[in-house]
Amino acid sequence: MAERDNRRGRRDDRDETPEFADRLVAINRVSKTVKGGKRFGFAALVVVGDQRGRVGFGKGKAKEVPEAIRKATEQAKRQMIRVPLREGRTLHHDIEGRHGAGKVMMRTAPQGTGIIAGGPMRAVFEMLGVQDVVAKSIGSQNPYNMIRATLDGLRKETSPRMVAQRRGKKVSDILKKDGEPAEAAAEPAEA
């Protein structure tokens, strides 16, 4: 008879950790007022990604900084989303994300542009694996809201394959320009 492991059907995710990179975005000292005075602790905000199209964020609170970072990292790994990237380096189309008073606009960029984004958005794009993007944050500059708005926008991104599947067409039909065949649109006209 085969030996049964004692995990009770749970997966062991500890083996997957080396494939993810993480970035500490913010750390705050927080306090809780109790009967005897104030209890101080730390809150950490972490972005985790595989730099190949998956990203997530988490926040953790603890009495010590390393424990708060560990909790935030674990939460981020549980909340990862997959984002389709064009040529593995940029977004497929311009997108806008919102969360609370925060609004984020993200635009595709030609190769060599780099990541033009501020603060927490830069961490999200680096962990996602985006190499060329232009992003602007409007409204709330709170790092929690900026990250949530960025991820809201990234969830809305669709690849040509997804659009073609939804419309019941071929990818080549979706990539046509103004009624031209896809091959003619891809190649410049000879003069």
From Swiss-Prot:
UniProt KW keywords: Ribonucleoprotein, Ribosomal protein, RNA-binding, rRNA-binding
InterPro entries on file: Ribosomal_Su5_D2-typ_SF, Ribosomal_uS5, Ribosomal_uS5_bac-type, Ribosomal_uS5_C, Ribosomal_uS5_N, Ribosomal_uS5_N_CS, Ribsml_uS5_D2-typ_fold_subgr
One record GO biological process: translation
PROSITE patterns recorded: RIBOSOMAL_S5, S5_DSRBD
Region annotated Disordered, chain positions: 158-191
Domain S5 DRBM: start-end pairs: 20-83
Molecular functions (GO terms): rRNA binding; structural constituent of ribosome
Gene3D superfamilies tied to this protein: 3.30.160.20, 3.30.230.10
Keyword Repeat: no
Pfam families linked: Ribosomal_S5 (PF00333), Ribosomal_S5_C (PF03719)
Gene Ontology CC terms: small ribosomal subunit
Bias type Basic and acidic residues, positions: 170-180
Biased composition (Low complexity): 182-191
Keyword RNA-binding: yes
Domain notes: The N-terminal domain interacts with the head of the 30S subunit; the C-terminal domain interacts with the body and contacts protein S4. The interaction surface between S4 and S5 is involved in control of translational fidelity.
Reported function: With S4 and S12 plays an important role in translational accuracy. Located at the back of the 30S subunit body where it stabilizes the conformation of the head with respect to the body.
Protein family per UniProt: Belongs to the universal ribosomal protein uS5 family.
Subunit structure, as described in the record: Part of the 30S ribosomal subunit. Contacts proteins S4 and S8.
Family matches, as HAMAP family: Ribosomal_uS5_B
Cross-referenced NCBIfam families: rpsE_bact (TIGR01021)
Protein name: Small ribosomal subunit protein uS5
The species this protein was found in: Dinoroseobacter shibae (strain DSM 16493 / NCIMB 14021 / DFL 12)
